[in-house]
């Protein structure tokens, strides 16, 4: 009985120590995630309270340019967690910002970034901006909800700004795609090529919000989503209503008007 009692006590002590070890590991993991999350949520005005004007968050551009010269914009969407800087990816390491934050430090949250093919130009005909979909709904997670029209209407416009201008973007369409299929286009030979591409995307889209106003420049916000495909992405295609548009009733008209403009 004494031997059994000692063995039981030893097992209990081991179980207690192991449980304590697991708790410590869990605390370290949670602390690490909290740290990464905090680093991935920089304030637009680090030295002052965050303020908004006409929906746009006020950004201290001088400060952020001194922190990271790759910063080119800031995006926020009212009623969501989307409120982040945007950096420009570089051709020599196009996926760098998938795992690095605005401070250039390793961070699994990354930071939203403009596709390297756009060469830092947010006015590229199809400017593609990527952001992670995190389990805590941070980063671009809320964009995956835009496939629902009611959600789009409740969370529009998308506020996007650069050091030089501010844009209230209207959502044109939302598409849920398999990232393993299809190509990516950011720049086109001419306006006709862009219109042809845009109308093709519109025809295939999961949700069409505006089928009559043909933009001449769009911004696609891209994030992972988890529904139909194994490697699924949600694309939220938006445009500045203040930028040039071609008002048409159907795709063929769009091509005709564009050809007339090019002539």
Where are these regions (language model features)?
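N-terminal Sec-pathway targeting helices
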Residues: 4-23
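Solvent-exposed, non-transmembrane regions of membrane-associated and secreted proteins
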Residues: 26-263
